[in-house]
Amino acid sequence: MAKSKFRPLHDRVVVRRVESESKTAGGIIIPDTAKEKPQEGEIIAVGSGARDESGKLVPLDVKAGDRILFGKWSGTEVKLNGEDLLIMKESDIMGIIG
């Protein structure tokens, strides 16, 4: 029995990559083989948060729907419900866009 929802644990988030442009500003079309994986994404699920030294739950600074930037090698690639997603820790996120 497969579940349709995935809830990350602790301080992890699930991110959907935002596809980069297939054309440069000058109009040159970039083939798929030359494209780098985008380092921008949208958070689709967040964990409950991390615990501090005293055991108190500290909620995450990001929420579902936030657009973020993350490092080139951040996260673990997974396939959930046929969609390629990333699972990463909140500390791998560089910032929120907008």
From Swiss-Prot:
InterPro entries: Chaperonin_GroES, Chaperonin_GroES_sf, Chaprnonin_Cpn10_CS, GroES-like_sf. Keywords: Chaperone, Cytoplasm. One of its GO terms (molecular function) is protein folding chaperone. It comes from the Bacteria. GO terms for cellular component: cytoplasm. One of its GO terms (biological process) is chaperone cofactor-dependent protein refolding. It is found in: Cytoplasm. Belongs to the GroES chaperonin family. Together with the chaperonin GroEL, plays an essential role in assisting protein folding. The GroEL-GroES system forms a nano-cage that allows encapsulation of the non-native substrate proteins and provides a physical environment optimized to promote and accelerate protein folding. GroES binds to the apical surface of the GroEL ring, thereby capping the opening of the GroEL channel. Heptamer of 7 subunits arranged in a ring. Interacts with the chaperonin GroEL. This is Co-chaperonin GroES 4. The lineage of its organism: Bacteria, Pseudomonadati, Pseudomonadota, Alphaproteobacteria, Hyphomicrobiales.
